[in-house]
């Protein structure tokens, strides 16, 4: 239930071509916008991504999205044309809130379509931040989770997080980091003052409720 004095955004990711549960998310249609952290498709291009995103658009036309490592790079062109892209880009989300994203991922054992060196992610993070650093509140959307975080824990103990994302969070301390990539690591925790939330795969029912109320920005891991 939303109140008149608050604003809500809904975040999720790792769609992997399964949006069967998206209309089960409470408040999705009434939210200020939808934030998508990456992996819209399974090695798909613009045609597949547009089919999926048009369904979400019909529920809520205010979309902020980026590709993950499982999406072909051409999808960024489509997102740019629609005005939805946040990868390597900073945008004003509300009066005093900036949002920025970094998609893709560092190399995986699976040779997925959109993998880059860690140094490239660092460049993209700096590029996006430069566009919105004047705003006092910040949401970082990072497909690759920060190194050492619960959001990057594999089931058997290995942590596969990203060092550039961690360094950026430690240095800038955004209010919220919406992340994904590691499906088994649905979690929420703080790194300094930054709330880091990985909702896992959308088809498993995880999403993030981001709320602005009384000038305070917070995020909560939710399940359908």
Give residue spans per PLM region.
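Beta-strand-turn-beta hairpins that frame and shape the catalytic cleft
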Residues: 2-10, 91-101, 133-138, 190-196, ...
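Metal-dependent catalytic neighborhoods of phosphoester/phosphodiester hydrolases
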Residues: 21-24, 40-57, 72-87, 111, ...
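Short, conserved loop/helix-junction motifs that constitute active-site signature segments
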Residues: 28-29, 54-60, 94, 132-134, ...
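Active-site neighborhood of phospho(di)ester-bond hydrolases with catalytic His/Asp-centered motifs
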Residues: 10-13, 34-39, 63-69, 85-87, ...
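Conserved beta-sheet core of the metallophosphoesterase superfamily
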Residues: 153-214
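A general structural detector for well-ordered alpha-helical segments in enzyme core domains, enriched
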Residues: 25, 51-55, 124, 161-168, ...
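Conserved catalytic scaffold of divalent metal-dependent phosphoesterases
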Residues: 17, 71-164, 223
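N-terminal active-site segment of His-dependent metallophosphoesterases
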Residues: 1-58, 134
């Amino acid at each position: 239930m939303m109140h008149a004095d608050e604003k809500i955004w809904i975040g999720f990711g790792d769609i992997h071509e399964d949006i069967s549960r998206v209309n089960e998310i409470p408040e999705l249609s009434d939210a200020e916008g939808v934030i998508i952290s990456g992996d819209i498709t399974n090695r798909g291009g613009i045609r597949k991504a547009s089919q999926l995103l048009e369904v979400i658009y019909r529920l809520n036309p205010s979309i902020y999205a980026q590709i993950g490592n499982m999406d072909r790079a051409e999808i960024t062109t489509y997102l740019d044309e629609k005005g939805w892209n946040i990868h390597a880009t900073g945008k004003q989300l509300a009066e005093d809130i900036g949002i920025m994203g970094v998609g893709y991922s560092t190399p995986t054992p699976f040779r997925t379509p959109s993998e880059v060196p860690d140094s490239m992610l660092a460049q993209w993070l700096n590029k996006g931040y430069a566009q919105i650093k004047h705003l006092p509140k910040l949401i970082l959307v990072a497909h690759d989770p920060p190194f050492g975080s619960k959001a990057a824990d594999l089931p058997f103990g290995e942590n596969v997080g990203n060092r550039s994302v961690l360094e950026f969070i430690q240095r800038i301390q955004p209010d919220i980091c919406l992340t994904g990539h590691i499906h088994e690591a649905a979690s929420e925790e703080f790194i300094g003052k930054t709330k880091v939330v990985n909702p896992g795969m959308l088809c498993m029912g995880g999403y993030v409720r981001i709320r602005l109320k009384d000038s305070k920005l917070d995020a909560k891991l939710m399940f359908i």
